[in-house]
Amino acid sequence: PGQGFAFGYGSINGMGTPRHELATPALSAGHNPAASAIPVARITDMLENPGGAYDYNGQHRTYPDTRMIFWAGGNPFHHHQDLNRLLRAWSRPDTIVVSEPWWTTLARHADIVFPATTTMERNDIAASSRDRFILAMHQVVKPQAQARNDFDIFADLAEACGFREKFTEQRDEFAWLRFLYDRARHQVQLAGHDMPDFDKFWAAGHVEFPQPAQGYTQFADFRADPVAKPLRTESKKIQLASARIEKFGYADCPGHPVWRAPQEWQLSPLAEKFPLHLLSYQPATRLHGQGDPGRVSLASKIHGREPLRMHPDDAAARGLADGQVVRAFNDRGACLAGLVVDSGLRPGVVAMATGAWLDPLEPGVPGSLCVHGNPNVLTRDVGTSALGQGPVAQSCLVEIEAWVGPLPPIRVHAPPPIAEAGA
């Protein structure tokens, strides 16, 4: 006990649930003829620098000149860093289309919104490679108002482009579910296991696979026979250094582990102006930004603002009290928050969950105060390195002060005003 290491302790919840490596129903993404993709954390860079050069994972690439954005699934106004910079870049494309069930900040910054159904309004199948169940997601209510399934939205778009039949393959929603389930069932049977037919599965509501006789241990096959079960590395072994990465010649990422001082931490010169290190973490009251207007998330807020935790010494030094509304700020932006005095934090560190919907005091104006408490108005938007180009949200310095004056209302949880055509 207490030895080794593992992965997947977070939201995926895969630890302690061993399963056989069996197929699950999944829809192929198909082939994208654009043959172009960027690291997701570099969205703002792409919009700011059409045709600009960047390095990624050993490749020298060029950002596309993006004139149109179609966003379905996800929300950059939740997960991206330095949201004020993103907002400025967001105005550069000619057209932005969003497929979305809710009036999120993303939907509010779109030219066209396709109202999409929620999981309650459509039939679907839930499955994961990390557990032993396949679930039938039965439709609970009919699509509300003008909401439509994403599949139907894209089928109509395909028809407008002249290839509806090629896209749908002459299947509707339920026919696709049956097809995907039957295909997975065939693969499972080839692996020596059994699954009920689709009708029995749909009526029962789930399929449960048997638990393996032995639990899963990371790298167990490799340890038992490194020759027959090599790892997918240059040496086919566990590596602490990579000759391949070394050859990339990246100044910010050599081929071996090194420690380098972050640009923003408490020993950097910027800490004289912004002495508190902000950590942003996954919320306990919602999934990322999903469910933020729900009662569980709302019950956790303080005067309607996202909680911010601070050590008692830091609060006392600033004359702040538990439950008070405060303003967190740096040179990138500012947001309001509800203060929680917490002795479990290290002095000099403050912590705030992600996921509060961005609610600018002046909508559409970069730099406007977020009255709700989205920490990504504060975080830095630079790549981790030329190798990975990931986010560096946890390297962020801020200052905290008391909010003085009337509290602005939270407006992002209510639908925006809708102008009728011809009005």
Predicted feature locations:
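Extended redox/cofactor-interaction regions of prokaryotic respiratory oxidoreductases
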Residues: 1-108, 118-125, 203-205, 209-318
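Catalytic, metal-anchored helix/loop core of enzyme active sites in primary metabolism
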Residues: 111
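Short strand-coil-strand connectors
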Residues: 135-137, 227, 234, 272, ...
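Long, contiguous, secondary-structure-rich segments that constitute the structural scaffold
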Residues: 144, 150-201, 273, 294-309, ...
